[in-house]
Amino acid sequence: MVGGSYAGIRAALTRYEYPETIFAAFSSSAPVEARINMTMYWDQVYRGMVANGWTNCTQDIRAALDYIDDQLSDEETASSIKQLFFGSGAEINSNGDFTSALTGIYGFFQSYGMSGGTGGLGSFCTYLEVDPETNGSTGPDGLAPLYGGQYVAERWAQWPVFTELVNENMDTNCRSLNESAPLDCDFSKPYGDPSAISWTWQYCTEWGFYQASNDGPHALLSRYQTLEYQQEVCNRQFPSAVVKGLLPPQPLADDVNKALGGWTIRPSNVYFSGGEFDPWRTLSILSTEDIAPQGVQFSTTIPGCGVETSENTVFGYIMENSEHCFDFQSTPTSGKLSRGLFTSAMLEWLPCFGQE
């Protein structure tokens, strides 16, 4: 059984729960640990940006957000800052919904890292980090120390593809970019896509994964992106479920881990992989976060067929400078290495097929 992301969770847990049915599994980028607070998602984005030479961009984003949050704290300026970014109609949004739309700059990161084409995070940082005096790249400290957070926020708002990117992500029509449709800049609308609805139900009821702001020196989000706001999104998506008592006050993450094992599972005949900067690795069996089990060694030594590794060992591989499910992309060398490890493991395990 092969899968990445949620399918990777299913691959690992299905082998764990039904070894008589599933002989082996490839579990890529799988956050098997349920947890409400997933603010560390953004720590991985920060690490990936810094590792790829964009420390200045992280600093400018924080400076811009400090200015934006300050403007949002006053009703007289809140409407203006919302309209600065998305035009007329944006002022109707709550501070939480508005700053949620600002996270659109990170939309392609987990799939492409600092790549992602014209709407990718690398393109945004390349656009942002231009000194207006020299028209050259900024230094390591970015723009804010010289020009201030307001300047950076205004430049962010002028990124040519930003409104289009947000419209696509939020199913809106801010600034009437689609001339054949009415103006629509309401970011509070519930999801309408069936796959988005089903996934939202899963994380709102069980898995958690609330990606609120990673407050502190590495913060990349507005302070209005709180855990409480994430819960509000769930309640808003399923209002009738709240009334009927079908939606719990918060996700039942502890119950999920108690039932399924979380990141302590060690099923035999399972290969785990993850990207170095994959935000979802923070809750995977290959997590290196402070909240994860400590002293666990990640080994590429193939265990024997049907042999579970010890609690302190995981058969797995972390792909260098990679993100989510990069072993299922054809180009990265690290992905090819990861697939090769699983192939080698299968060649070793297959002779005992049917003998377990």
Residue ranges and their predicted role:
Residues 6-19, 25, 32:
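Short glycine-enriched nucleophile-adjacent loop
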Residues 103-356:
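C-terminal subdomain of alpha/beta-hydrolase-fold enzymes, centered on the catalytic histidine
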Residues 1-3, 28:
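Short beta-strand immediately N-terminal to the catalytic nucleophile in serine-hydrolase-like folds
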Residues 10-13, 56, 60-63, 76, ...:
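Extracytoplasmic/secreted proteins, especially bacterial periplasmic and envelope-associated proteins
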Residues 16-19, 40-45, 286-292, 333:
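Short secondary-structure boundary/capping segments
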Residues 5-11, 280, 324:
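His-enriched metal-coordination microenvironments in redox/metal-binding proteins
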Residues 21-141, 145:
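A catalytic-pocket lid/entrance helix-loop region that shapes and gates access to the active site
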Residues 10-14, 37-38, 282-285:
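A short acidic (Asp/Glu
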